[in-house]
Amino acid sequence: MVMKFKMSKNVICYTWLSVCLSSAIPAFAVQPTLKPSDISIPAISEESQLATKRATTRLTQSHYRKIKLDDDFSEKIFDRYIKNLDFNHNTFLQSDIDELRQKYGTKLDEQLNQGDLSAAFDIYDVMMKRRYERYTYALSLLDKEPDLNGQDQIEIDREKAAAPQTEADANKLWDARVKNDIINLKLKDKKWSEIKAKLTKRYNLAIRRLTQTKADDIVQIYLNAFAREIDPHTSYLSPRTAKSFNESINLSLEGIGTTLQSEDDEISIKSLVPGAPAERSKKLHPGDKIIGVGQATGDIEDVVGWRLEDLVEKIKGKKGTKVRLEIEPAKGGKSRIITLVRDKVRIEDQAAKLTFEKVSGKNIAVIKIPSFYIGLTEDVKKLLVKLENQKAEALIVDLRENGGGALTEAVALSGLFITDGPVVQVRDAYQRIRVHEDDDATQQYKGLLFVMINRYSASASEIFAAAMQDYRRGIIIGQNTFGKGTVQQSRSLNFIYDLDQSPLGVLQYTIQKFYRVNGGSTQLKGVAADINFPEIIDAKEYGEDKEDNALAWDKIPSASYMEVGNINYIDNAVNILNEKHLARIAKDPEFVALNEELKVRNERRDRKFLSLNYKMRKAENDKDDARRLKDLNERFKREGKKALKDIDDLPKDYEAPDFFLKEAEKIAADFVIFNSDQKINQANGLSEAKTESKK
């Protein structure tokens, strides 16, 4: 079967699942530095075929979600592979997809079982040639400065958009993309000559990256289309990626401590390592795009279109050296440059820390837990002794941004706050349920307890928070958690008898599911706060329930446990504390400013198009800067600091106050007062009862 499509200059090309380019490229003023013949698909290796076969066997036999690898599932893998290769649906034509689907749509199941990668490589080959064509067209648009005064718009999120029907449709999408790139640089006060040079280099670099494609890259993307179709936490790591991953979790690795992800030509921050320079800076956030990297001195290098591993190597470096990142914020606005000092990710930076704060005359303790590392419970035990010695009247366990860790530590930590009993239930792929219990019959801390959470609290954090909530042991404050209630394990695809076999990569796949002691899963729903804070992390953008194929929420029978807190007492306290909390933040200038910022964020999140009119975009950016400058200067005034004249004058080492924690401490102080009043009332009631009985 042949595929037919039109190209520029009305040239008609016929190809066997490929794209003809060589004679169809007109003579543009800005030319690509590479020819179509320079773009070639790497050869399929025997190792890749063996890795595919073994990965397929393990995923179909050992995954928690039992799947049937048939024609229907093959179609789903096909769709996800196309999506992985063309996330914004601006590279493939619909005719490409139709042709590829007809040939391979229902064949991937058989090929995977056989270790056959022909479909994966053929589809990737079409993508490479189409991408070359798109960037060649993008370069042609740099021939002259475009008109940025019209009413053109760019579609912000094309994840669910249809593929372009024709080359003309694809060109319209790239017209918009190039204009947007130009506007983003123009907003940084770049002249047209600078913009043209920068984008010429960027687009040619993206083409050059195509020539650097390795077979491992294709296999990893393809097998991840298969793995992620089963569930979002199942993945395949190529030998090179697995090696990098192992290095990244080695605490001696020197860098800034970020986990990055790549979509199309963009690299963004997926998560921040607790205690690492990026997290400590408070200036980087998941979703932020990295568009440039520079060292302590010299130019910032444009990294749009870079390979992920190349960018990682650029960011890593010796302890004490500086790296500069040019960031496009996830929440919008113009790019900014952030300077970080590379450092080792030290275990002491990830360790639990204890602080005290006097609030309304009450001594409030806070234990910040960045992760559930091995040895956490022993560390917290020591902190609880200090807490008792300092006569703390309430404790806040801060689990914000804590993505989890060791299950054993989540269970043991819970045991410090209850006498004994079940903490979490785990069900495996064979429906066997195991109850993890605290059985030491001792309770280290018996005082007033709060657990602080947010959208990035996940896994082990959710286990601890859920246990405290189900036992009525503590009050949960903050934002609904992430909702990751599954357990993964990593397995090398090399077998013990593979004596001379080169590395085949690693498979991470889901094997179990977590359940609360009340029987409900933490999966998808997470843990809801008893007292809610504003959604500073957008729940409509981040969370397990945003994944299109996450495992469903369900429940199993409740474990046998006894609530330690009085239901009516806790509910009454929550109602009173929440009322005070809402009244307070309604007047707090930090929360008022935050709510204004969140209103803008939510409005922009919901809009589907972005203007390509430079004056309109500049006016919006100027308005954003003016609003943020006003908020900063009002804060500085309250702090007795000198006002800023420009938002760019903000010191690089400036750290914003943690007013969420300050409010949590005020809630804790309210609870101390409430609890004291209740005891007085009970004592008075008992005294009155005794007096009445004597009469």
Swiss-Prot record:
Bilayer topology term: Peripheral membrane protein
Annotated TM spans: none
GO MF annotation list: endopeptidase activity; serine-type endopeptidase activity
SUPFAM superfamilies given in the database record: ClpP/crotonase, PDZ domain-like
Matching InterPro entries: ClpP/crotonase-like_dom_sf (IPR029045), PDZ (IPR001478), PDZ_sf (IPR036034), Peptidase_S41A (IPR004447), Tail-specific_protease (IPR005151), Tail_Prtase_C (IPR020992), TSP_N (IPR040573)
Pfam family, one: TSP_NTD
EC annotation from Swiss-Prot or TrEMBL: 3.4.21.102
GO terms under biological process: proteolysis; signal transduction
Cell compartment(s), UniProt: Cell inner membrane
Residues in the signal sequence: 1-29
Residues of the active site: S459 (charge relay system), D470 (charge relay system), K484 (charge relay system)
UniProt GO cellular component terms: outer membrane-bounded periplasmic space; plasma membrane
Residues covered by the PDZ domain: 256-316
Keywords, alphabetical: Cell inner membrane, Cell membrane, Hydrolase, Membrane, Protease, Serine protease, Signal
Function: Involved in the cleavage of a C-terminal peptide of 11 residues from the precursor form of penicillin-binding protein 3 (PBP3). May be involved in protection of the bacterium from thermal and osmotic stresses.
Cross-referenced PANTHER family: CARBOXYL-TERMINAL-PROCESSING PEPTIDASE 3, CHLOROPLASTIC (PTHR32060:SF22), TAIL-SPECIFIC PROTEASE (PTHR32060)
Family: Belongs to the peptidase S41A family.
Protein name: Tail-specific protease
Organism: Haemophilus influenzae (strain ATCC 51907 / DSM 11121 / KW20 / Rd)
Chain's gene name: prc
